[in-house]
C-alpha cells in the first residue's frame, strides 16, 4: 500500500529517515524543516553536509519549509528532539489530515511533566493515533544504507504493522509492537546508561565495569518499564538491549561522548548538555523511580553527577558498596 509520508525535522535523523523511506520507492516522501534557506539548499544540492557529510539524498525526496506541506500525509514522523515535540505538535497539528498517524522518533521523556512522548502528543493531538519509532540506529548508518533494524510501536498491532510496512526498506527493517511504553522507555533510559558508560570510559575504569553497567542497567530498565505498565520482553529487544549496546559502545553516540567528557573531568558546554537526551532523562527518570519505589541506583548516580550533587569517585564507591543481593 502506497502512503504519503512527511518527516518533520531536518536534522541528521529526520533527513536520514526521509532518505531511506524515499529510496524504498513505495511512498511519496517530503522532508519538512523550519529553515527556508536550509531547505532551499537541500533541494538544490541534494546534500546535507552539516549533519550527513557526503551522503547524496535521493531525487525522489521532496523538501518544504511550509507547515502545510504535511496536509496530505497519512503518516507524519516527528524527528525533532524530545523537548521540542510539544511545540511541534502545536505548530503542525492544524495541518494534519483527519486520519494521519503521528510517529514520534525522539528518545526522551517530557521534562516538565515526566510524561512519555506518546502521552504528551495524545494530549496535544487528541484526534490522532500516536506511534513511536525507536531502536539501535544512527543517522549516518541509516542514510548510508547500512543494514539497520528498529522497532515501531502503536496502540494496536494493526497500526504498528501498517507503519512497519510503509517505512521499512531494503536496508531499513522495522519490527512492529503494541508496547509503546516499553519501546519509549528503552529509548529514553538507554541514553542515561550510555552517559554512565561514557563516564566509565572517561575515567579509564575498564571494560569489565562497562559490561557490568550494561547488564545492571538493563535490569534497572526492566524494573522501571514493568512498573510503568510496559512489557519486560520489550526491554530485551531492539528498543532496549539493542539500543543500549549500540549507544553504550559507539563513539557516534552523543550521550556516550558527553559521559566521557564528564569522566575525564572536562568542563562540559551547557549547550552540549542541552542537546544530550540522556541529560534530560536522568533527572526525570530518577524522580519517577522514587515515586514508583523502583530501585535505579545507576540512573540516580548519573542524575546526581550531572546536577553536580555527587562526585564521580563517590558515585562509584556508593555503587560498589551497596548491600550484596541476588541478581
From Swiss-Prot:
The keyword Cytoplasm appears for this protein: yes
UniProt-annotated binding residues for sn-glycerol 3-phosphate: 107, 135, 190, 243, 253-255
GO cellular component: cytosol
Subcellular location: Cytoplasm
Enzyme Commission (EC) number: 1.1.1.94
Pfam family, any one: NAD_Gly3P_dh_N
Function: Catalyzes the reduction of the glycolytic intermediate dihydroxyacetone phosphate (DHAP) to sn-glycerol 3-phosphate (G3P), the key precursor for phospholipid synthesis.
HAMAP family xrefs: NAD_Glyc3P_dehydrog
Protein name: Glycerol-3-phosphate dehydrogenase [NAD(P)+]
Name of the coding gene: gpsA
